[in-house]
Amino acid sequence: MKTGIIGLGAMGFPIAMHLHQAGHLACAWNRTHATAEALAAHCGNLEIAVSPAALAARCELILISVSADADLRQVIEAMLPTLTPGTIIVDTSTVSAATAHDVARQVAAQGAQFLDAPVSGGVEGAKNAALVMMVGGDAAALEKARATLHAIAQRIVHMGPSGSGQAAKAVNQIMAAGINQAVTEALAFAQAMQLPLDKVIEVVSGGAAGNWFLSHRGATMIRDSYPPGFKVALHHKDLAICKHMADEANLPLPITEMTLMHYKNLMEAGYGAEDISALFRLKKP
């Protein structure tokens, strides 16, 4: 399928590179034109669209990777006049399920299809084409796009109707908050007990409490280094979406609420662009 991508940020750029390497990418658009030009320098014959509407006019499959609900709505509004029937839009962003429902209806009115398909795996997953994709929307549309999407994702799971992908991603983000809290708190305790932290990470990683976050972030956080894989500010944004969804379901999320408060403190201290493992700053003795 002739494929285009909108959004070339920390996730979108490596996604675009893998689509190009697999022979799928025909067109790209990014709000910052210089980034699109940098992609074109890597990709040879890639067309840089002058607008989302121009990209929509020539692509059968459109991937979107943006930061927030408002960005997605703006891009969809811009594309609607030139969307052709049968076009499939795959949004890999993390937005609210309500926004996914709304834009899916707008796209369907043009005879096209919208899949909310947020991803997990962070920047490393995007760079290694090892993302996990959770998809809401029409199952048949997903099957049409699946071969292309496998260029960027190692696992693609259809979760149900429109909005289900974003609901599943909310589950992921809530769980990530709890893991971050547990790992940073445990390592702070280990430090207070004057244990060798490298050895703590080694031994715990091999047991029942071992997890991806400890294995991939432990070594850097104990050296007070927090290069962004998943930025504090972005997880804060995602958890705010989760809390809103939970409030509507009358479900308390105490760990999520605590994490929102901690992230707010980090952001106010100037650490919003650091990795979420920077939570260790607030925990260590």
Question: Where would I find each of the regions flagged by the language model?
Answer:
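NAD(P)+-binding Rossmann beta1-loop-alpha1 motif at the extreme N-terminus of oxidoreductases
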Residues: M1-I64, T87, V123
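Rossmann-fold dinucleotide-binding core
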Residues: T3, T94-I174
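Hydrophobic beta-strand scaffold residues
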Residues: A26, I48, F114-L115, I156, ...
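Rossmann-fold NAD(P) dinucleotide-binding segment
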Residues: P52-Q113
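Active-site-proximal catalytic alpha-helix in oxidoreductases
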Residues: N128-G136, V157, P161-M193, V204-H216, ...
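Interdomain hinge/lid region at the active-site interface
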Residues: S162, G210-D275, P285
